[in-house]
């Protein structure tokens, strides 16, 4: 990379702290803003006394179809790490369905051809909501409609209940009209049924190998038809809620739909299986279970010989899966790649829940290192418990590891993700999220003191909002309440901007407050700017104010 000729005051070393899920809202704690409700002496000083901007982290600013779409950690880190905006999975799949390209592709033809040739079942497995973070129910409906047009003999659905990217007890709001639609299809002669399911944080959708038992539980109900039997998904959900009135959708147990004591939709030899999630992190492990010959994460039993496809390819380096319906975004020339090619030392750190975000997603959906000699990646293992039970998560160990790395001063660019605001926020537990934020406050302060000592510039930002809006709000911005008058928890991300602050030990660097509509895509150039390097062609401009 070329050194910039514009500046003379750059420290050339930067620490980027990503406070996952910590957006900005002017609303107070009475509206569910856990950030406003927390005692944050250091972070409030940062946001009020150091140069700070609010930048866009949702919608079109991160490659989503519209500005009504929430940002998320995957697209956020893609944009942070690439300095540009790429159309993301949600938009790519929707566009491919609208154009018909998805159904003219070789993979779809193979999926349909396999079921017709073998007179076998087409299984659609994926997250069942319109959250548009991992999946969209409209995509599933489009696949069903096309499969019926092409006269697939039998269709079975394996639904993962959301309650995380959508309201926490909304499963029946999606299920009831969907079942009505399925009933109309059955009356027209289609053999189609829901076969299995469960909450997304109970089965199937593990990521970063945090808890393979989730995938095993999913395998048992989807593939083997082993589990608690119900006559319908509605009966399963209502039963689980009656047994545990406090349970929310993402934690609902697994279930199997049965007829006359037999599962209606086991996955068997000759079947076709499509995983309908477009986002990769929580799709990789179940895809490995279906496709990996030398698989040792759990006992699959006899592996059914199926034709497996993803609605997208989830890992381009691993070519996982080999068969996919829509090509993923082609993200090139990332910041990490540029730095590695120029031998600029980098350090990336997080706990398991966000480790892939500061590595794989930051690097443009690429696994591994660009140059292991100049890059150091560190993962701290996450606990396998509900995160509101331990809202500090692994923030202390992360802070200690990063302090050590900063004091060793071997790298020029450091990046870290603190998962607390997002992962605790997703539980819907307001008080636990307040505790998480208060714990993070001390961690960030410790790192700033180390940066001051080492003359390292500190950038503090987020990838999207979550902790900033923990209660459901109506269209007028008022808190929605349940029948007991209690605020209804919100577990999804928000549409709010995120703060970005710059802490310069020499107190020289300022933001350009006149930049039009800045977003996450401006952060990569900002990092290079502070380090004294020219911005690559095509990157969104730096947020730094030019020297006069």
Swiss-Prot record:
Enzyme's top EC category: isomerase
Binding site for Mn(2+) 1: 422, 426, 493
Active site: 73 (phosphoserine intermediate)
Chain residues that bind substrate: 134, 164-165, 200, 207, 279-282, 354
Binding locations of Mn(2+) 2: 20, 73, 463-464
PANTHER family (UniProt xref): 2,3-BISPHOSPHOGLYCERATE-INDEPENDENT PHOSPHOGLYCERATE MUTASE
Protein name per its UniProtKB record: Probable 2,3-bisphosphoglycerate-independent phosphoglycerate mutase
Organism: Leptospira interrogans serogroup Icterohaemorrhagiae serovar Lai (strain 56601)
Primary gene name: gpmI
